[in-house]
């Protein structure tokens, strides 16, 4: 059995670590490079960096931050935000990232997934899905809709259908983020996470809503995710990476420990 991964997520805006609730009310809370180093030393399995305004502002990638992070940590990390071409992907990987994450760009141009997978391998391509619960309809039979630009634009695209599509196009992993749960610390959207995880054969990362280690254990058991993405609970010092992994282990979840 593969170990379940604990992945801190660092949202970056203007070169600074930031955090909000449901993609709104973001406040700066620290230096992303220093925070990345601390999480690496604390036993994080991977890290995720999102430039949360690059896509909506139509600007490039935070390559300076990627380069500085790569010099400080020695675990896999992925980078998303502002990546819309194979050239963007190449630049991020050359700067030191192991994976690239595409979200809005993939919805607008799904070919970016297959082009990236062909150029760099599926293991490098993560598709981020921002998802909102809208109720079952003819257009959205699963009841979950894909949204982009931080949840501000609904796409009329069913989340379950999109997950199957991105796998077929060559994505190596899906990061499924619930806009409804994001930053609220009330738990992951387990129905959504399980639905996506059962529909595809590639790993699914649960994202949005972690408030305590129990929620993380729920995500990888009930939700069938391969990993739990976390932010607020570690950014604000409520729990350490060790706290999270120790509790998950007590729940019978296999995790990687460095202590």
Swiss-Prot record:
GO terms for cellular component: cytoplasm. SUPFAM superfamilies: Ribulose-phoshate binding barrel. It is found in: Cytoplasm. The keyword Mitochondrion does not apply. Heterodimer of HisH and HisF. Pathway: Amino-acid biosynthesis; L-histidine biosynthesis; L-histidine from 5-phospho-alpha-D-ribose 1-diphosphate: step 5/9. Its EC number is 4.3.2.10. GO terms for molecular function: imidazoleglycerol-phosphate synthase activity; lyase activity. Keywords: Amino-acid biosynthesis, Cytoplasm, Histidine biosynthesis, Lyase. PANTHER family: IMIDAZOLE GLYCEROL PHOSPHATE SYNTHASE HISHF, IMIDAZOLE GLYCEROL PHOSPHATE SYNTHASE SUBUNIT HISF/H IGP SYNTHASE SUBUNIT HISF/H. Belongs to the HisA/HisF family. The active site is at residues 11, 130. This is Imidazole glycerol phosphate synthase subunit HisF. GO terms for biological process: L-histidine biosynthetic process. IGPS catalyzes the conversion of PRFAR and glutamine to IGP, AICAR and glutamate. The HisF subunit catalyzes the cyclization activity that produces IGP and AICAR from PRFAR using the ammonia provided by the HisH subunit. Gene3D superfamilies: Aldolase class I. It catalyses: 5-[(5-phospho-1-deoxy-D-ribulos-1-ylimino)methylamino]-1-(5-phospho-beta-D-ribosyl)imidazole-4-carboxamide + L-glutamine = D-erythro-1-(imidazol-4-yl)glycerol 3-phosphate + 5-amino-1-(5-phospho-beta-D-ribosyl)imidazole-4-carboxamide + L-glutamate + H(+).
């Amino acid at each position: 059995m593969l170990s379940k991964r604990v992945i801190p997520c660092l949202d970056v805006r203007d070169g600074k670590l930031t955090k909000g609730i449901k993609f709104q009310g973001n406040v700066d809370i620290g230096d992303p490079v220093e925070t990345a180093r601390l999480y690496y030393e604390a036993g994080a399995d991977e890290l995720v960096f999102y430039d949360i305004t690059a896509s909506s502002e139509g600007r490039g990638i935070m390559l300076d931050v990627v380069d500085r992070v790569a010099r400080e940590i020695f675990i896999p990390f992925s980078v998303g935000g502002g990546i819309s071409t194979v050239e963007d992907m190449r630049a991020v990987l050359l700067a030191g990232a192991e994976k690239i994450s595409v979200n809005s760009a993939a919805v607008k141009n799904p070919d970016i997934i297959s082009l990236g997978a062909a150029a760099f391998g599926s293991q490098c391509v993560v598709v981020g899905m921002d998802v909102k619960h809208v109720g079952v309809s003819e257009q959205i039979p699963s009841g979950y809709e894909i949204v982009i630009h931080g949840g501000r634009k609904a796409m009329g695209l069913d989340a379950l259908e999109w997950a199957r599509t991105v796998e077929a196009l060559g994505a190596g992993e899906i990061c499924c983020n619930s806009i409804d749960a994001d930053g609220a610390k009330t738990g992951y959207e387990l129905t959504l996470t399980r639905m996506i995880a059962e529909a595809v054969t590639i790993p699914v990362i649960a994202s949005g809503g972690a408030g305590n280690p129990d929620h993380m254990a729920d995500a990888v058991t009930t939700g069938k995710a391969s990993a739990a993405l976390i932010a607020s609970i570690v950014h604000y010092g409520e729990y350490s990476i060790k706290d999270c992994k120790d509790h998950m282990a007590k729940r019978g979840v296999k995790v990687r420990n460095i202590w």
